[in-house]
Amino acid sequence: MSSGGLLLLLGLLTLWAELTPISGHDRPKFCYLPADPGECMAYIRSFYYDSESKKCKEFIYGGCHGNANNFPTRDKCRQTCRGK
C-alpha cells in the first residue's frame, strides 16, 4: 500500500475512534453524577461529563467538596468518561 493510502487509512481509523464512545457499561459510575461546584468560593475552570449529551462540558469548581465528576482538562474528562 502506498504511503498516501496508509495515511488515509490512519486518518479514517482516528476519526472512527474519536466518534465512537465507549459503552455505558465501561464508563465509571461517577461520570453520571451532575456537575457539583462544591461549597468553597474559588474560581477553578473544570470539566464534567454530561451523560445526557455525552460530552465533556466546562463548569466552575469552587475548590472543595464537589464530586468525582470533576476534571482539570477536557481531555482528561474524555479519557475517563468517553474513552478518548
UniProtKB/Swiss-Prot annotation:
Residues 31-81 form the BPTI/Kunitz inhibitor domain. Its main location: secreted. SMART domains: KU. One of its GO terms (molecular function) is serine-type endopeptidase inhibitor activity. CDD domains: Kunitz_PPTI-like. Gene3D superfamilies: Pancreatic trypsin inhibitor Kunitz domain (4.10.410.10). The record marks M41, A42 as: Reactive bond for chymotrypsin. This is Kunitz-type serine protease inhibitor C3. Residues 1-24 form the signal peptide. Keywords: Disulfide bond, Protease inhibitor, Secreted, Serine protease inhibitor, Signal. Belongs to the venom Kunitz-type family. Disulfide bonds join C31-C81, C40-C64, C56-C77. Serine protease inhibitor. Expressed by the venom gland. It comes from the Eukaryota. One of its GO terms (cellular component) is extracellular space. InterPro entries: Kunitz_BPTI (IPR002223), Kunitz_BPTI_sf (IPR036880), Prtase_inh_Kunz-CS (IPR020901), TFPI/VKTCI-like (IPR050098). It is found in: Secreted.
